[in-house]
Design a protein with these regions (language model features):
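Charged, compositionally biased N-terminal leader segments and the immediate start
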Residues: 34-83
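Residue-level signature of catalytic and energy-coupling elements of molecular machines
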Residues: 61, 91, 138, 156, ...
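Conserved pre-motif I regulatory segment
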Residues: 72-152
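Conserved SF1/SF2 helicase motif Ia
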Residues: 162-190, 201
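Conserved RecA-like helicase motor-core motifs
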Residues: 202-212
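Conserved motor-coupling elements within RecA-like helicase/translocase cores
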Residues: 211-247
Length: 251
């Protein structure tokens, strides 16, 4: 008959062997996983290298697409700058009349045709009404937005002012332009702040927020409002605000 001590030794030995086998299998599985991951990483690196080669080849043959876009936009900036003196010499009334004439010219032209004139005119109007003149880089930002692309700008780089360029241009078609901001306060602030410029150009401005809607009215004065700029926002129906040439709202 087998002793208890002998059986314990046998069981311990068997358990020890099982541990070794399990550890060996786990180590082997980990080895296979690492090898597979290394292969995938190598493949990705090879793909990236090949893509870089293709990009370099395309750039060599066709040129850097981003630089091409910037060169094209810079030519427009130069054209706008050349027109600046023309609008600078005009009186306020002449400037307003020039905006109306450009608007009427859309029956024979498209927006891209009149963009340089409109941008130059709006920049001059902004200088007079708001005391702010668009920089060249802001003109580029305005053109990028007009083309339906995304213009990335940091806080303080003048997004609100930049928007006045494509907004004024596209509002000339009379189909309504919507400007979307991130909250109710900014929608009201930007509409009030830029409303003076749009009003100078003969464009109406509406605001639609969660619980109210307004029309920018230079003759209206809500003395109860702490922000002096927002005092010109007259309560209106949502329909009236939507019918404005330019409507500010939130996302």
């Amino acid at each position: 008959m087998l002793s208890t001590r002998f059986l314990n030794k046998v069981l311990k030995g068997a358990f020890f062997n099982i541990q070794i086998m399990v550890k060996y299998k786990i180590d082997f599985i980990l080895f296979l996983m690492e090898r597979e991951m290394s292969k995938k990483t190598a493949k990705k690196k090879n793909v990236m290298v090949e893509e870089n080669k293709v990009d370099k080849l395309l750039t060599t043959v066709f040129g850097d697409p981003q630089k091409k876009v910037l060169r094209r936009l810079q030519r427009k900036v130069d054209e706008i700058n050349n027109l600046s003196e023309k609008y600078k010499k005009m009186s306020d009334e002449k400037l307003k009349e020039a905006f109306k004439k450009l608007k009427k010219s859309l029956s024979k032209k498209d927006l891209d045709d009149i963009l340089p004139d409109v941008f130059a005119l709006v920049r001059e109007a902004s200088t007079r009404v708001l005391g702010m003149r668009h920089f060249d880089v802001q003109l580029i930002g305005g053109m990028v937005l007009h083309e339906g692309k995304v213009a990335e700008m940091k806080t303080g780089e003048g997004k609100t002012l930049v928007a006045t360029l494509p907004v004024s241009l596209n509002a000339m078609e009379g189909r309504g332009v919507h400007v979307v901001t991130v909250n109710d306060y900014l929608a009201q602030r930007d509409a009030s702040w830029m409303g003076n410029l749009y009003d100078f150009l003969g464009l109406s401005v509406g605001v639609i927020i969660n619980e109210a809607s307004f029309i920018f009215d230079p003759e209206y004065d809500n003395e109860e409002h702490e922000d002096e700029n927002m005092r010109k926002l007259r309560p209106a129906t949502r329909k009236e605000a939507y019918a404005a040439d330019i409507t500010y709202g939130t996302n």
